[in-house]
């Protein structure tokens, strides 16, 4: 007897012996005979329309790859494993969407997996503060991530023991003479934020408030002097005070000081002639001795040139006289070729060129 339709192997052969044992162990509701035949016909029509005519018992269909389960996902206890009849399993696998929607945002390392429709923007990680204050990473969700379209989760602030605020930093002493510590006039931010507030595309971000700037160097010293006067202490040494530099005009007009004096210091004439009717004074004793020879007539310096018996009271006079015998003229005029044996004669000659 010829059959009008091709005979396909039974779908019961797709099930492995292990699945059969599990099906016998777990109780299930037996479907009605009419409903099962109708479901099988629908599945068969769907397979034929998809062009799976060569499907056999040896090559069961491979299910599409499933995405890895999100982090921190645990199956519900007490639920039986999803085993059913082979026909229903095959239909469910063919009619199941390719990818299951994610269950919710999950944290993988430094990235946040969020469901579609929510944008995730990565930002550079912030620098953690000290042991006190609110941790930046806890106050704004996971560190280095910014979730758009959703309000940021505010973390808990880490404080010191018994909820006390951190102690203010001590300022260094103004001078070695007095170790007076003056507290700052206003709150100061010990850790400036590494990044400024960026533009927000979702809701308004948390507002950042910065304290007033620290007082300048001049204001700090003025406050220190006022506080010392109020406490009855001596003001700090003037060497610690800072003064503004002078104007550029004063710097240009100021002339550098010379290392040596511009005029020689006038020496006191302490050597005085003791002869009557002579009150000459000299700064050097040698000069006074030469002057006394004029009163006594002593001439110790003699010219040794042959045939010359001149005598002189001073050595420089003998030197000039000796140049007459030798003809030596050390004083040369730089404007002409004339030379002189005495410096005073050269000075008189230079006046003629002027």
From Swiss-Prot:
SMART domains, alphabetically?
A: ZnF_C2H2
Looking up InterPro entries in the UniProt record yields: Znf_C2H2_sf (IPR036236), Znf_C2H2_type (IPR013087)
Biased composition (Pro residues) is annotated at 60-84, 163-176
Entry's Gene Ontology BP terms: cell morphogenesis; cellular response to cycloheximide; cellular response to hydrogen peroxide; cellular response to interleukin-1; cellular response to laminar fluid shear stress; cellular response to peptide; cellular response to tumor necrosis factor; cellular stress response to acid chemical
A single GO cellular-component term on record: chromatin
Q: Keyword annotations for this protein?
A: Activator, DNA-binding, Metal-binding, Nucleus, Phosphoprotein, Repeat, Transcription, Transcription regulation, Ubl conjugation, Zinc, Zinc-finger
Q: In which tissues is it expressed?
A: Predominant expression in the lungs and spleen.
Name the UniProt record assigns to this protein: Krueppel-like factor 2
Origin organism is Mus musculus (Mouse)
């Amino acid at each position: 007897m010829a059959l009008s339709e091709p005979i396909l192997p039974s779908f019961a052969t797709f099930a492995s012996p292990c699945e059969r044992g599990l099906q016998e162990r777990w109780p299930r509701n037996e479907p009605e005979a009419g409903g099962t035949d109708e479901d099988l016909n629908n599945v068969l029509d769907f397979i034929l329309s998809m062009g799976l005519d060569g499907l056999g018992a040896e090559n069961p269909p491979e299910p599409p790859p499933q995405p890895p389960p999100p982090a921190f996902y645990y199956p519900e206890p007490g639920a039986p494993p999803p085993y059913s009849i082979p026909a229903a399993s095959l239909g469910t696998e063919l009619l199941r969407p390719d990818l299951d929607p994610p269950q919710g945002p999950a944290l993988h390392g430094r990235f946040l997996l969020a469901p579609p429709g929510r944008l995730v923007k990565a930002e550079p990680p912030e620098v953690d503060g000290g042991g006190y204050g609110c941790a930046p990473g806890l106050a704004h969700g996971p560190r280095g991530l910014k979730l758009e379209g959703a309000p940021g989760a505010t973390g808990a602030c880490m404080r010191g023991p018994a909820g006390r605020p951190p102690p203010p930093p001590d300022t260094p002493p103004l001078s070695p003479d007095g170790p007076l510590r003056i507290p700052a006039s206003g709150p100061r931010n010990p850790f400036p934020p590494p990044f400024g507030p960026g533009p927000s595309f979702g809701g308004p971000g948390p507002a950042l408030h910065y304290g007033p700037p620290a007082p300048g160097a001049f204001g700090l010293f003025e406050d220190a002097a006022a506080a010392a006067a109020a406490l009855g202490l001596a003001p700090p040494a003037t060497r610690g005070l800072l003064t503004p530099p002078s104007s550029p005009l004063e710097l240009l007009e100021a002339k550098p000081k010379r290392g040596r004096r511009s005029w020689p210091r006038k020496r006191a004439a302490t050597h005085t002639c003791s002869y009557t009717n002579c009150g000459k004074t000299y700064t050097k004793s040698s000069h006074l001795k030469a002057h006394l020879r004029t009163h006594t007539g002593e001439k110790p310096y003699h010219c040794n040139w042959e045939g010359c018996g001149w005598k002189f009271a001073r050595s420089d006079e003998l030197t000039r006289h000796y140049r007459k015998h030798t003809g030596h003229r050390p004083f040369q005029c730089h404007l002409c070729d004339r030379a002189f044996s005495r410096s005073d004669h050269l000075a008189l000659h230079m006046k003629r060129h002027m």
